[in-house]
Structures are given as C-alpha cells and as structure tokens.
Amino acid sequence: MDDFRKYATKHLGMNAMVLDDVIKSQAGYLNPYILEERQLNVTQLDVFSRLMMDRIIFLGTQIDDYTANTLQAQLLYLDSVDPGKDISIYINSPGGSVYAGLGIYDTMQFISSDVATICTGMAASMASVLLVAGAKGKRSALPHSRVMIHQPMGGAQGQASDIEITAREIQKLKKELYTIIADHSGTSFDKVWADSDRDYWMTAQEAKEYGMIDEVLIKK
C-alpha cells in the first residue's frame, strides 16, 4: 500500500486527502494495475484490460446482465478489430442468469472468431453451457477444475395462470439448454436430461469423457 501511495502522489497527481477517499471507496480492494513501457511511453492498465489486448477474456463472477453486456461487448470488439483470430475465455463462475448467459452464448456463435474456453476453477450451471459452447477442439480445463450441469431454477407467485406461464417458460429453457449441451458435447439429449435432474458434478477428466471439454491442461 505504501508503494501505491507513493506512486499515486508522485505520478498521478493525487494529494493525500483524495487518495484516502479513493482507497476508502474501494472498500479494501484495489483492482490490479500494471505499468507497461512502450517506446519511452508508460501506459497504466488494469491487468484484465492488458490481457484483453492479447484476446484473453475472464469470466470470473456470477453471470448477470452487467457481466453479460461487458463480455458480449468484448467479444464483438475483438472480432471487429481482427476477424477470424481466436479469442480465449477463461471461466471460473458458479453460473447465474440463464437469459444473460444465452446472450453470451449467441454472441459466441455469431462472431467469426473461434472462441476457446478454459475452465480454471469451476464452470457450473450456465457457466458450464458457455464452457461446452467453445469452438470444437479448443475447450479445456485445468486438472482440478469442476464442471456442473443441472436443470434451470426459477420461482413464481401470484395467480395460478401466471405460475403456469412461468412454469412453461422454465420447461422451454430446460429443453433449450439441454439441446445446446447435447449438440456441443455429443452426449445424447436423453442422457443430459437424466443427468441434469439434480446437480451433476464432473472432474476435468470426467468432463472430457462427457464431451464438455476436449483437453485437460497439464504442464509438460
């Protein structure tokens, strides 16, 4: 923290009072930054933005509308600046909103660049759908990663007709998600349906055998 304080006051022109306000507003967390020197020019970037310059995107949170919008924008931008060049998404997520996740999925399928997916910790629920949706032959996981599939969850209240409408929508989503997993994994729809009735956990090797990934990454 002392080094950061010295850097901020010397190079960013922040006085001690402003710096204290910034630190307090971050509630103890500072987004990681790096300094990159290019032809005598120094550029300050957060580490995730620097990695995106190498076409690497991180999905390391629960999937919600904000996360989905950001990730879709990153995919569209990288595809526009260099169409057809691979993009990598590193996934460590418990899942989240199905609708937000389907927006990411459709964008992955829409762009011309192949999207490689790598599970670095956990790809559960909707995140597992994004993992399996990577380009064939370019889906992988680290050895101790976990992959989990299950049926979509939801709830409803109000009039009986409203509950019926919500229940029908959940059933549609269920079939849609299972079809995506079956199509990309090569596992039969009936097996995906049966396995997803409850939380179905897989190790990296089991996920490979299931068709969720193509390779378990092991350092050679």
Swiss-Prot record:
**Which GO terms of the molecular function aspect are on file?**
ATP-dependent peptidase activity; ATPase binding; serine-type endopeptidase activity
Q: Which leading EC class covers this enzyme?
A: hydrolase
Q: Which domain of life is it from?
A: Bacteria
Q: Name one GO cellular component term.
A: endopeptidase Clp complex
Provide this UniProt record's keywords sorted from A to Z.
Cytoplasm, Hydrolase, Protease, Serine protease
One record GO biological process: protein quality control for misfolded or incompletely synthesized proteins
Catalytic residues, per the record, are 125 (nucleophile), 150
Pfam families per the UniProt record, alphabetical:
CLP_protease
Its EC number(s)? 3.4.21.92
Q: Which Gene3D superfamilies match?
A: 2-enoyl-CoA Hydratase, Chain A, domain 1
- CDD domains (UniProt xref): S14_ClpP_2
On whether Protease is a keyword of this UniProt record, the answer is yes
Q: Which reaction does it catalyse?
A: Hydrolysis of proteins to small peptides in the presence of ATP and magnesium. alpha-casein is the usual test substrate. In the absence of ATP, only oligopeptides shorter than five residues are hydrolyzed (such as succinyl-Leu-Tyr-|-NHMec, and Leu-Tyr-Leu-|-Tyr-Trp, in which cleavage of the -Tyr-|-Leu- and -Tyr-|-Trp bonds also occurs)
State its location(s).
Answer: Cytoplasm
| Chief location bin | cytoplasm
**UniProt family annotation:** Belongs to the peptidase S14 family.
Q: What does this protein do?
A: Cleaves peptides in various proteins in a process that requires ATP hydrolysis. Has a chymotrypsin-like activity. Plays a major role in the degradation of misfolded proteins.
Quaternary assembly: Fourteen ClpP subunits assemble into 2 heptameric rings which stack back to back to give a disk-like structure with a central cavity, resembling the structure of eukaryotic proteasomes.
PANTHER family attached here?
ATP-DEPENDENT CLP PROTEASE PROTEOLYTIC SUBUNIT
Q: Which NCBIfam families does the protein's record reference?
A: PRK00277.1, PRK12553.1, PRK14514.1
Q: What is this protein called?
A: ATP-dependent Clp protease proteolytic subunit
